[in-house]
Amino acid sequence: MKVDELHKNLTDSGYLCTRQFAAQVSASINNKPVAGAFLYGSAGTGKSYLPMVISKITGHKMFFFQCAPGTKEDDLLMKMWPDEKSSSGVKISPGAVYEAAEASQKQKVILVLDEWDKTRPTADAFLLDFFQYGRISIPGKQTTANFKNLVVFFTANDERDFGEAFQRRFPKIDMMPLSPRLIKDALSMT
């Protein structure tokens, strides 16, 4: 999507931003080999909302994972549920990253890893392998992502540093509070 078209669509969807910001977002969703960006900023700057609006604009199916302190790789791949019927007492179902990779085989998808800076640093290395080869597996299942159909957004509040190799995979977009002009525009829309 071209910059002016994206800027208009974001604004029409109620996500007020500058053309310069829309240019950064446009570049990120056209990034290769994997599209997406690191969205950095303080609370309330629209980091989590931006991918939702982009999903609405583009029609891409969205997968969302809310990270918590200490989130580890297995949390991204699978969900574990108590199950009295299984011999282990646990039922395993695909998690957000696996589901997004699998869905990318058939359609365009957006994967949001919200508050990524709360994960353990080992999660960065896990995703580096995924973004290199696209393969992912859980007990009894394996899939490979179609990077042409996958857009990944990470949100962060700078709670921890990311490895240099991990940071090189995606552009960084600094999310700033709205300017007084955009606040005035937002108020006039209500």
Where on the chain are the PLM-derived regions?
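AAA+ P-loop NTPase catalytic core and its hallmark functional loops
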Residues: 1-190
